[in-house]
């Protein structure tokens, strides 16, 4: 019979992490993993121990791609034996870029004069979106920011400008340059004035 602290039926040193959708990820203390985080073989005396994992990465556990940026994840790998495919899960930076592109495009096509119901729905969408964003640290940061500065969904222009200011706050936190909010329609709706998007 297993000790109270050990899950019954699983070998010692092995735990399961249950993921959304019922999938599960096995965590072991003695597995050597390849560049994709898959268990390649059991660790032996000749296998060097791994370095401490950065925040969002735990030894013996597949990394949460949405929680960790690519550079941090790569630092935990001893060597990279395969190229990454385009159809693999996004890392934190990719997810962030695509999320902002989606949100800015959503704001660019929001109605010029939304009904009260549309205004309420969009504000609710932003709040719900921040609860389910896959990077928990990012989601918590956005929830705090929108708690201090509620979405302005009164018009398309107001919503686009509110979102641009929010994005610039996050950019400053990350040490990135601000985007000129006077150019949101050019960037996300109409295309650049020089015709390069035509």
UniProtKB/Swiss-Prot annotation:
Residues 33-46 have a biased composition (Basic and acidic residues). It is found in: Mitochondrion intermembrane space; Mitochondrion. Disulfide bonds join 135-138, 164-181. Residues 88-188 form the ERV/ALR sulfhydryl oxidase domain. FAD-dependent sulfhydryl oxidase that regenerates the redox-active disulfide bonds in CHCHD4/MIA40, a chaperone essential for disulfide bond formation and protein folding in the mitochondrial intermembrane space. The reduced form of CHCHD4/MIA40 forms a transient intermolecular disulfide bridge with GFER/ERV1, resulting in regeneration of the essential disulfide bonds in CHCHD4/MIA40, while GFER/ERV1 becomes re-oxidized by donating electrons to cytochrome c or molecular oxygen. Residues 1-59 are annotated as: Disordered. GO terms for biological process: mitochondrial disulfide relay system. Preferentially expressed in the liver and in testis. Its main location: mitochondrion. GO terms for cellular component: cytosol; mitochondrial intermembrane space; mitochondrion. Its EC number is 1.8.3.2. Gene3D superfamilies: ERV/ALR sulfhydryl oxidase domain. It comes from the Eukaryota. Its cofactor is FAD. InterPro entries: ALR/ERV, ERV/ALR_sulphydryl_oxid_sf, ERV/ALR_sulphydryl_oxidase. The keyword Flavoprotein applies. Homodimer; disulfide-linked. Interacts with CHCHD4/MIA40. Pfam families: Evr1_Alr. This is FAD-linked sulfhydryl oxidase ALR. GO terms for molecular function: flavin adenine dinucleotide binding; flavin-dependent sulfhydryl oxidase activity; growth factor activity; protein-disulfide reductase activity. It catalyses: 2 R'C(R)SH + O2 = R'C(R)S-S(R)CR' + H2O2. FAD binds at residues 92-100, 104, 133, 164-176, 187-188. Keywords: Disulfide bond, FAD, Flavoprotein, Growth factor, Mitochondrion, Oxidoreductase.
